Amino acid sequence: ADFCCHNKDRDAEAEIVADYVNSNVDYVFGGGAKLFENREDGRDLFKELRDKGFQTPRSWDELVKIKSGKVFAVPYPVDAPLPDERGDLLARASLKGIELLSQNDNGFFMMIEGSQLDDYGHFNDINLLMQETHDFDRTIGAIYEWAAKDGETLVVVTADHETGGLTLVDGDLKEGKIVCKFSTGGHSGVMV
């Protein structure tokens, strides 16, 4: 939403998602379907998106059948399933976006987010943080492979901050063991 929706209050989710209807975005994949329908204001944002020329698949199976055009795929009521439950969904959804966006002769810009990395840092949940990190790493690997074959694509990976103050305090390479501790439930000054 950062690149096409604007609001002074990051928690004003219902207002933020309404901005998608008038955005120039060509491909969206993610969670939050409950914010698009059965709204307090009576709007059906999926219908409004379709009226603006978007296809709005509500499942992965519907999405894979789409071969061109603008796509707004929000198949999950809230967040996507947990990393261990969703498999390589982030990589597949990202590559599907590239398949559609690369049809534009003028090129494309795409932002892919490991959206739960921040949450799991706030929760100090090392298990879910590692799952999400591995998922994001595999996704970036798939994108780099595509970009290498394409030969004309710049891939930039960045972060805005670290969350949780995760510190490695011990470990053993031979045993494949690490011991880590969180120092905060908030953001830290750790370099990313």
What is each of the regions a protein language model found here?
Residues 1:
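Mobile, glycine-rich extracellular loop/lid and propeptide segments
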Residues 4-192:
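A post-motif C-terminal structural segment
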